[in-house]
Swiss-Prot record:
Function: Involved in unsaturated fatty acids biosynthesis. Catalyzes the dehydration of short chain beta-hydroxyacyl-ACPs and long chain saturated and unsaturated beta-hydroxyacyl-ACPs.
HAMAP family the record matches: FabZ (MF_00406)
Name under which the protein is recorded: 3-hydroxyacyl-[acyl-carrier-protein] dehydratase FabZ
Reaction catalyzed: a (3R)-hydroxyacyl-[ACP] = a (2E)-enoyl-[ACP] + H2O
GO molecular function: (3R)-hydroxyacyl-[acyl-carrier-protein] dehydratase activity
Active site: H56
GO CC annotations, alphabetized: cytoplasm; membrane
Catalytic class of the enzyme: lyase
Family named by the database record: Belongs to the thioester dehydratase family. FabZ subfamily.
Length: 151
């Protein structure tokens, strides 16, 4: 008999214990629906107080697409670290690859971005994921990203 699929949710406190990233470069607020090292959804609440909006663009703030890609990578890092270590002890995680990146719609202050990550490959402590950034169910960006744990 197969064991039931277990979903996990982690809050900002667990993310802070898991990733080495800190303000202003911690770009996810929580990760929900983590299914082992296979999938999960990172959540980012975008506010007008984001440091990037000081220059991107003051008169019409648009959340930078590259920060959404980093949010996908951080979500992948949380999924990977928690699946391997099973603890909340920080380890270094590196952004390994980015492919097939597309930006489809602008993200504005007040939006909540969901980073939907699904594993497409794995080798030891390296993972590759397909990521879709969604706002209100619509894809605003997508990319294939890779992450690697380092000792």
């Amino acid at each position: 008999m197969e064991s039931p699929i277990r979903f996990e949710n982690v809050d900002i406190n667990t993310i802070l214990k898991t990733l080495p990233h800190r303000f202003p470069f911690l770009l996810i607020d929580r990760v929900i629906n983590i299914r082992e090292d296979y999938s999960g959804i990172g959540i980012k609440n975008v506010t007008v107080n984001e440091p990037a909006f000081q220059g991107h663009f003051p008169e019409r703030p648009v959340y930078p697409g590259v920060l959404m890609i980093e949010g996908m990578a951080q979500t992948a890092g949380v999924i990977g670290i928690l699946s391997v270590t099973g603890t909340e002890k920080p380890r270094a995680v590196y952004f390994l690859t980015i492919d097939k990146c597309k930006f489809r719609k602008p993200v504005m202050p007040g939006d909540t971005v969901e980073y939907h990550l699904t594993r497409t490959g794995r080798r030891k402590t390296m993972w590759w994921f397909h990521g879709e950034a969604k706002v209100d169910g619509q894809i605003v960006a997508e990319a294939d990203v890779g992450a690697m744990l380092a000792d």
